[in-house]
Amino acid sequence: MAVSAKIEIYTWSTCPFCMRALALLKRKGVEFQEYCIDGDNEAREAMAARANGKRSLPQIFIDDQHIGGCDDIYALDGAGKLDPLLHS
């Protein structure tokens, strides 16, 4: 099954939750676009606008659908719902 979903993740370089979410995506073997927004307030505002006002990191989007943060993507994976999204 080929990965065709567009995956985007907003991160902060020293954020442990960001590192954990990135590790999951790497384990899944999927390609993703990472936006490291360290100290970039404009980028953070743009992310928050896409993420229903959420400013915490990471924020993850699959095919422009807001997934949430680290706990959210791991919950989807644990429920068996992440792979279908990644391979949509």
Curated annotation (Swiss-Prot):
GO terms for cellular component: cytoplasm. Keywords: Disulfide bond, Electron transport, Redox-active center, Transport. InterPro entries: GLR_AS, Glutaredoxin, Glutaredoxin_subgr, Glutathione_S-Trfase_N, GRX_bact, Thioredoxin-like_sf. PROSITE patterns: GLUTAREDOXIN_1, GLUTAREDOXIN_2. Disulfide bonds join 15-18. It comes from the Bacteria. One of its GO terms (molecular function) is glutathione disulfide oxidoreductase activity. GO terms for biological process: cell redox homeostasis; cellular response to oxidative stress. SUPFAM superfamilies: Thioredoxin-like. The keyword Cytoplasm does not apply. Belongs to the glutaredoxin family. Has a glutathione-disulfide oxidoreductase activity in the presence of NADPH and glutathione reductase. Reduces low molecular weight disulfides and proteins. This is Probable glutaredoxin ssr2061. It comes from Synechocystis sp. (strain ATCC 27184 / PCC 6803 / Kazusa).
